[in-house]
Amino acid sequence: MNIHEYQAKELLREFGVAVPTGYPAFTVEEAVAAAAKLDGEVKVVKAQIHAGGRGKAGGVKLAKTDEEVKQYASEILGKTLVTHQTGPEGKVVQRLYIEEGSAIDQEFYLGLVLDRSIGRIVIMGSSEGGMDIEEVAEHTPEKIHKEIVDPVVGLRPFQARRLAFKMEVPTKLVNEFSDMVMKLYKVYVETDCTIAEINPLVTTKDGNVIALDAKLNFDSNALYRHSDILALRDTTEEDPREVEASKHDLSYIALDGNIGCLVNGAGLAMATMDIIKHYGAEPANFLDVGGGATKEKVTEAFKLILSDDQVKGIFVNIFGGIMKCDIIAEGIVAATKEIGLDLPLVVRLEGTNVDAGKRILDESGLAITTANSMADGAEKIAALVR
């Protein structure tokens, strides 16, 4: 789950991380009122969307007067920002963050991620702050420095200092920088983050270390123990279909193809998408109904798939272990009748109660094509939608 920059900064502030003073605003009037509460000559008007690259897209403006704050707020609110992370459709700005300006001396990058290949949290730092870290990794990878955290002992202070020296943080600010690294690590662990990123982390001309921007993503599977963080969720920033899927405990991700997929198990779902591509077609979604699917859940899954106008056919690929094939078959028949499905439908069932499941499909009288294997099913649905 993602949250907005201003929410991330408020959370960082609770953990003692230094961030500039700022206030969220949902209207132009609120933006002007927020600016009036801030000290300093420069105010920063920031678009709040769940995507990076806002500055390059015109979503971050420096204002020196209240009139400029009003002007920029009027221009940005309601604007569709298109960045390298939003896709060509962009995101509509529905809220702003009005923040006091900072006298920047140097900019750095600091981020924490989980490296699944080694099963460790990795802290990354670079002197190339303010840039996309992916670009730095591609063009000047030697400027990215890493510290790997031992999960038994956690991040040690000497590692934070060592990272500071590698990044060439000014000597007089090494302790302050190291303290921020330790606090960001605490945020990452205690709130179950998947990404904790400060870009840029800046040193100021008056000798402070400040998180000028912040990005926190959280493990959705851990949100049950963070009700305060879950309350920060902004569903308007998410795909409406993914929001609807989460209500029914379905894992759904929209893709660009035309074959809807309904599968149980993430691994099988990914394999299904691969084999669809192997036969020259493109999957329209990732959809995992999980191990406890009911007829109602299958019906909701079909509705989700069909909410995508690009879908020209559906491939159901089920391996019945915990979930029984006859239950899935009943759900498929019920969903097909309720929705009035008029698209090609290929079903491959295997596992527990598979014979009963196939019998239910055969006796339904519906135009359902059955498959004997995953490859057979993928080949059939690819041929039917051509």
Curated annotation (Swiss-Prot):
Recorded catalytic activity of this chain's protein: succinate + ATP + CoA = succinyl-CoA + ADP + phosphate; GTP + succinate + CoA = succinyl-CoA + GDP + phosphate
InterPro entries according to UniProt: ATP-grasp, ATP-grasp_succ-CoA_synth-type, ATP_grasp_subdomain_1, Succ-CoA_synthase_bsu_CS, SUCC_ACL_C, Succ_CoA_ligase-like_bsu, Succinyl-CoA_synth-like
Keywords: ATP-binding, Ligase, Magnesium, Metal-binding, Nucleotide-binding, Tricarboxylic acid cycle
Residues bound to Mg(2+): 199, 213
Superkingdom, taxonomy of origin: Bacteria
Top-level EC class: ligase
Domain named ATP-grasp: residues: 9-244
E.C. number: 6.2.1.5
Cofactor binding mode and count: Binds 1 Mg(2+) ion per subunit.
Binding site for ATP: 46, 53-55, 99, 102, 107
Cofactors (names): Mg(2+)
This protein's pathway: Carbohydrate metabolism; tricarboxylic acid cycle; succinate from succinyl-CoA (ligase route): step 1/1
Database matches in PANTHER family: SUCCINATE--COA LIGASE [GDP-FORMING] SUBUNIT BETA, MITOCHONDRIAL (PTHR11815:SF10), SUCCINYL-COA SYNTHETASE BETA CHAIN (PTHR11815)
Subunit structure, as described in the record: Heterotetramer of two alpha and two beta subunits.
Similarity comment: family membership: Belongs to the succinate/malate CoA ligase beta subunit family.
Function of the molecule: Succinyl-CoA synthetase functions in the citric acid cycle (TCA), coupling the hydrolysis of succinyl-CoA to the synthesis of either ATP or GTP and thus represents the only step of substrate-level phosphorylation in the TCA. The beta subunit provides nucleotide specificity of the enzyme and binds the substrate succinate, while the binding sites for coenzyme A and phosphate are found in the alpha subunit.
Listed name of the protein: Succinate--CoA ligase [ADP-forming] subunit beta
Species name: Exiguobacterium sp. (strain ATCC BAA-1283 / AT1b)
